[in-house]
UniProtKB/Swiss-Prot annotation:
Keywords: Metal-binding, Nickel, Oxidoreductase, Selenocysteine. This is F420-non-reducing hydrogenase vhu subunit U. The large subunit of Vhu is split into VhuA and VhuU. Each contributes two ligands to the [NiFeSe] center. The gene is vhuU. Its cofactor is Ni(2+). Residues 26-44 form a propeptide. The F420-non-reducing hydrogenase vhu is composed of four subunits; VhuA, VhuD, VhuG and VhuU. InterPro entries: F420-Hydrogenase_large-U, NiFe-Hase_large. It comes from Methanococcus maripaludis (strain DSM 14266 / JCM 13030 / NBRC 101832 / S2 / LL). The keyword Lipid metabolism does not apply. It comes from the Archaea. NCBIfam families: VhuU.
Amino acid sequence: MVDEAKLNLIEIVLRAYDPUYSCAAHMIVKDEQGKVLLEVKKEE
C-alpha cells in the first residue's frame, strides 16, 4: 500500500530542490527494489 502522506512529502521536497519538477511532463517513483510505484503523465 502506498502512503499518500509520504508521497506528498516527497513531492514537496522534490519541488523545493528542483523547480522544474513541478512542470515535469513525466514522473516515475520507484521503491528500493526498483519497482515502479507511481507513474504520472501530465496531460497537455
